[in-house]
Amino acid sequence: MKKVLNFHFSYIYTYFITITTNYKYGDTEKIFRKFRSYIYNHDKNSHVFSIKETTKNSNGLHYHILVFTNKKLDYSRVHKHMPSHSDIRIELVPKSISDIKNVYKYMLKTKKDIKMS
């Protein structure tokens, strides 16, 4: 958590992103790799922290991603570079300790309070 907190306050923007796909048309892992490549081309100094999750209900695979960057993401440009069947949700995380802790906690799917050290 300490590293995530450091990145959150060291970079201008922190985005919480979820990537899912319709398996009929695409591979979530390929889309994640393409997205990660897009982010690093967008800002070479950015940092990506991701968690891959498989849901048992629908046998679906999706990614929860934190992107730390000094350049603002243009949502429409991101979507333009991704396949049309991919579902990418992008949210800006406010610059507060409680907000980043809640996002991180959600990503880890834990009910426990997260320590800062």
Swiss-Prot record:
It is found in: Host membrane. Its main location: host cell. It comes from the Viruses. The keyword Flavoprotein does not apply. Gene3D superfamilies: 3.30.70.1910. Disulfide bonds: none annotated. GO terms for cellular component: host cell membrane; membrane. It is a single-pass membrane protein. Coiled coil: none annotated. Keywords: Host membrane, Membrane, Transmembrane, Transmembrane helix. The chain crosses the membrane at residues 4-26. Pfam families: 117-like_vir, REP_ORF2-G2P. This is Uncharacterized protein 117.
